[in-house]
Amino acid sequence: MEKLLEVKDLKVSFFTDLGETQAVKGAGFAIGEGDFFGIVGESGSGKSVTTKSILRLGPSNCKIMGGEILFRGEDILKKNEAELRGIRGGEIAMIFQDSLSALNPVYTVGNKMVELIRRHTNMNKKEAKARVLELLTAVGITDPEKAMNSYPHELSGGMRQRVMIAMAMSSDPKILIADEPTTALDVTIQAQILHLLLELQKKNNMSIILITHDLGVVAQTCKRVAVMCGGYVVEEGTVEEIFLHPGHPYTQALIASMPRVGGTFEQFLERDFSDGNGNLCPFLNRCKYADKTCEACLPKYYEASEGHRIFCHRREEKR
């Protein structure tokens, strides 16, 4: 696989009056052109912080402490703000979970989209307006003229998410990062948005990074997936490998905790609210396989098959 984006040993911390909190302790993954890549994990696993760090969108108390983020072989972390503007919202775009908060309440959809398009292109205002109508139509909005003249609060949740996707697509990005784009939507609208993302990905040969805690969404849409726990990617592979042959105990527990149609889930995955030890496996306190080796040092990645990596000491015993 030719790598379009590669994240290597990323470390991200937040600083408060109480000190430093490590949100991402060593995340790494790679995606190719036209890839549909999922990042799954519990709340607090570091998946959103990891992807926002790709565009350096963290708050003021967030600092990238180490690692590399290579886009077409160049490290994004070494670029200045002017260079980053050409990538952020251009070659790499992002849609967020809460579309109402992400849209400016004092701007109509059309005004905001025209501003965005003109920032990244040489279009005049008339051309940009025509492009807005084209984009809103492309994402399935039946009355694009009305939507263009509406304020965010006048649109439904599903319509706002379609607007967010249209805004992200306005610059023809090579990579679209979708941060839990369907979490706040009902099941019917969720299916429509996922179908739309799949259509756009195939039509534009665009790579998509989908962040979610929903394994069902991953199974439905993604080709490859990374499983995050406690700031680390503990397993990475194809969707088939992760679902049919999960190698890490955390991945196994996630899949086992999914409710089954006509039955109950196999086990309850308890939460661990402790900070843990950044130099040990993030699943150590909850793992039924943990032994003295696990308590001694951080595991290394083991390649179970080509492209299928497992972050565990005792991987062979659990397969």
Residue ranges and their predicted role:
Residues 150-155, 159:
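Conserved ABC ATPase signature
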Residues 1-4, 13-26, 57-63, 80-83, ...:
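A short, flexible loop at the N-terminus of ABC-type nucleotide-binding domains that lies
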Residues 3, 142-145, 236-319:
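Short catalytic/signature loops enriched in Gly
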Residues 56, 177, 181, 185-264:
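P-loop NTP-binding/switch modules centered on Walker-like glycine-rich loops
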Residues 170-174:
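A short, proline-enriched helix->beta-strand linker immediately N-terminal to the Walker B motif
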Residues 64-75:
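Conserved ABC transporter NBD signature motif
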